[in-house]
């Protein structure tokens, strides 16, 4: 694993103990290594990233929230610095089971869950299935009413045979073409920010790091996108699917819940946030102005402030 000497190791710079490692049983019962970091003391607050991302996406929230809570950031299986078991196919819903096991391993009391995008969908499912694990729930720009994959590159990866993606990974093509890959990723990541200029070269380095330096990342992300695409197809065809199950069971979420949505989110419109709020009984909705899909990067100051205010209001 190579880290550019000009770049400080993000884990080391962010968490007192740097990057830590936890072994859980995954959804199929295999031991799996999960990368995580934690900072602060008090009640646990877990930050959950979205599709193709990793803990770095919460870089602007760790310091602010850890003044009041024990903040835990982890990379989901297959993402970031966590293990990527290429020889095993994933099945839908595995992330919910694994998230449950991570919480049980790291927390001995109900946690605050702050989850963005696909992570929010996982958190909603967990709140329905294991409400005792969650004290407060905060979800940001969640694809709970998504009717299609929101970006052409996601659609492309979802259509590409996994064997092809594994070959790209094994040949280390993203590593060999790292400057080009970073440039393309930078263009796309800026498109989900209200102010694209806030994304730095260091940000691009770390956002793309797992793809260029950690073999297996591209293949596992493609696999997750294929699962998501199948889900949407099944939803459209009225076949059994997890999306419908989550949608139909939103009223079962009883813990105080905050729904945050970027007003300018071009992936999942703010109307989805209003609809989600209407379906969760004990919820509050806040639309974030001047904010696109990537709220944890693009609207971090107001996001952190709103989270802390909500937790104070609900006495947590």
Predicted regions and their residues:
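Short beta-strand/loop motif that positions the catalytic acidic residue
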Residues: 253, 259-261
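Active-site loop/oxyanion-hole signature of alpha/beta-hydrolase fold enzymes
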Residues: 15, 27-30, 37-39, 73-118, ...
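Conserved HGGG/HGGXW glycine-rich cap/lid loop of the alpha/beta-hydrolase fold
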Residues: 35-84
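Catalytic active-site module of serine/aspartate enzymes centered on a nucleophile-bearing elbow/loop
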Residues: 274-275, 279-316
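Acidic catalytic loop of the alpha/beta-hydrolase fold
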Residues: 264-268
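Conserved alpha/beta-hydrolase catalytic His-Asp/Glu region
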Residues: 175-249
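Alpha/beta-hydrolase fold catalytic core
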Residues: 1-45, 66-70, 97, 101-109, ...
């Amino acid at each position: 694993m190579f880290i550019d000497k000009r770049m400080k190791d993000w884990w080391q710079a962010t968490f007192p103990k740097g990057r830590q490692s936890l072994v859980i049983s995954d959804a199929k019962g295999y031991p799996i290594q999960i990368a995580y970091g934690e900072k602060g003391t008090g009640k646990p607050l877990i930050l959950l990233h979205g599709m193709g991302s990793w803990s770095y996406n919460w870089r602007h929230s760790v310091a602010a929230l850890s003044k009041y809570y024990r903040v835990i950031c982890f990379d989901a299986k297959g993402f970031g610095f966590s293990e990527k078991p290429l020889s095993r196919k994933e099945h839908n819903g595995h992330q919910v089971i694994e998230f449950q096991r991570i919480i049980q391993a790291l927390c001995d009391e109900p946690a605050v869950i702050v989850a963005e995008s696909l992570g929010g969908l996982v958190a909603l499912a967990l709140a329905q299935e294991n409400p005792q694990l969650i004290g407060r729930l905060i979800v940001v720009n969640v694809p709970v009413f998504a009717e299609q994959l929101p970006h052409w590159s996601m659609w492309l990866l979802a259509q590409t045979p996994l064997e092809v993606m594994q070959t790209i990974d094994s040949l280390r093509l993203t590593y060999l073409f790292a400057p080009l890959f970073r440039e393309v990723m930078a263009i796309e990541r800026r498109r989900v920010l209200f102010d694209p200029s806030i994304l730095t070269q260091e940000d691009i380095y770390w956002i793309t790091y797992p793809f260029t330096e950690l073999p297996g990342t591209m293949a596992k992300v493609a696999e997750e996108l294929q699962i998501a695409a199948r889900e949407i197809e099944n939803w459209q065809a009225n076949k059994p699917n997890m999306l419908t199950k989550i949608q139909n069971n939103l009223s079962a979420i009883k813990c105080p819940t905050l729904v945050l949505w970027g007003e300018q989110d071009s992936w999942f419109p703010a109307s989805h946030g209003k609809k989600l709020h209407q379906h969760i009984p004990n919820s509050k909705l806040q639309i974030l102005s001047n904010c696109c899909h990537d709220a944890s990067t693009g609207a971090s100051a107001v996001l952190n402030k709103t989270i802390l205010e909500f937790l104070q209001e609900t006495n947590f």
